[in-house]
């Protein structure tokens, strides 16, 4: 689920604290009960380190078990993101890096290597306080980038590459459809030219 951002939140990210602050603001939009449940988000940044989007990729307990790294990269590929942040909340005061958190980050790094998007950090925010942990700040991201544990097998790597190609082609089709729509081209012609559905075309601005 794509999360709406305010103009002030679509800003230049200069530190892990910037991400933690914005994600805490997003978490606080929810009611008290929902805040205590685990959320996993990804944050896409452009090459100038400005936020492009925030996406909620999993919610509930255990949220991280629902995460499929290959699927997560569809939106950053569509948005042309260059950097990806992972963020999740924790309701306990233990802000240490757990083994399942590190495994998720490791897997995301390996898929990112294939599609050309760098996983820059994994940030854990506290649901009740302003405490947070940044893997980048404590040097854990450098350690995980050296890991070979989750390097995809050849067949998996080829599927991931194919997904990246398909998303790039889709982005081109969307650009063409936007131009045709702007020129008031008949929607049936746009559908034939791009392969997009009428519903997809209607959403384009």
Where are these regions (language model features)?
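Elongated, amphipathic alpha-helical interaction scaffolds
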Residues: 170-205
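Short, solvent-exposed loop/turn segments at secondary-structure junctions
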Residues: 92-96
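Beta-strand-loop-alpha "switch" segments that mediate conformational coupling across diverse proteins
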Residues: 121
């Amino acid at each position: 689920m794509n999360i709406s951002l305010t103009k002030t939140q679509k800003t230049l990210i200069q530190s892990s604290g910037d991400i933690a602050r914005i994600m805490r603001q997003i978490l606080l939009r929810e009611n008290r009960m929902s805040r205590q449940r685990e959320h996993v988000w990804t944050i896409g940044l452009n090459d100038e380190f400005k936020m492009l989007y925030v996406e909620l990729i999993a919610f509930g307990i255990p949220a991280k078990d629902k995460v499929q790294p290959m699927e997560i990269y569809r939106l950053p590929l569509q948005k042309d993101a260059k950097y990806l942040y992972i963020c999740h909340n924790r309701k306990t005061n233990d802000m240490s890096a757990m083994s399942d958190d590190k495994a998720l980050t490791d897997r995301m790094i390996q898929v990112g290597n294939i599609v050309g998007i760098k996983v820059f950090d994994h940030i854990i925010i506290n649901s009740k306080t302003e405490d947070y942990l940044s893997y980048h700040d404590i040097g854990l991201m450098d350690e995980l980038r050296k890991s070979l544990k989750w390097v995809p097998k050849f067949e998996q790597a080829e599927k991931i590459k194919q997904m990246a190609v398909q998303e790039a082609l889709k982005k081109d089709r969307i650009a063409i459809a936007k131009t045709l729509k702007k020129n008031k081209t008949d929607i049936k012609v746009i559908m034939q030219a791009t392969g997009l559905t009428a519903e997809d075309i209607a959403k384009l601005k």
